[in-house]
Design a protein with these regions (language model features):
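Vicinal oxygen chelate
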Residues: 5-13, 44-49, 68-131
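Core segments of cupin and vicinal oxygen chelate
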Residues: 2, 11-54
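Alpha-helical elements of the RecA-like P-loop NTPase motor core of helicases
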Residues: 19-20, 91, 127
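Short, charged/polar, Gly/Pro-enriched secondary-structure boundary elements
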Residues: 52-55, 65, 123-127
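Short, flexible helix/strand-to-coil boundary loops that buttress conserved ligand/catalytic motifs
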Residues: 22, 59, 94
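Acetyl-CoA-dependent GNAT
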Residues: 59-64, 131
Length: 131
């Protein structure tokens, strides 16, 4: 048996704004909007990055606008990490995110050997940007 991650999913209060975030900062290709006939109000779009699994952005009228629970660390996924290939690419993307008020932590070398910066999506999900 070969096991790999096919995709990860993120709830969002604003599907189009979330899709724009991934397109603008990560040059992602955004798939067509899907609207469920079985679950009225549910819609999703897939984010395709240059390599690796895709990200499914999902929304519905039941998703609260503030899904961050005031920044609390709660059970569940903590973040998604995206590799951009080099220290220079991390630095450049971190500058753009900082200018737009989305950078949480400046680029740095972590104790476990990663060069990374951390950004927050408009919904509050954390994205680690690694080299």
């Amino acid at each position: 048996m070969s096991v790999k991650i096919a995709h990860a999913a993120l709830w969002t209060a604003d599907l189009e704004t979330s899709a724009d975030f991934w397109s603008r900062y990560f040059d992602a290709t955004i798939g067509e909007r899907y609207e469920s006939r079985r679950r009225p109000g549910f819609a999703s779009r897939f984010v395709e990055l240059d390599g690796g699994p895709s990200i499914e952005l999902m929304t519905g009228p039941w998703v609260p606008e503030d899904i961050t629970r005031a920044g609390a660390e709660v059970p569940g996924w903590a973040h998604i990490a995206v590799s951009v290939g080099s220290h220079e690419a991390v630095d450049a993307l971190a500058r753009r995110l900082d200018e737009d008020g989305l950078l949480v932590s400046q680029p740095r070398m972590t104790g476990d050997g990663f060069y990374e910066a951390v950004a927050r999506t408009l919904d509050g999900s954390l994205v680690e940007i690694t080299s």
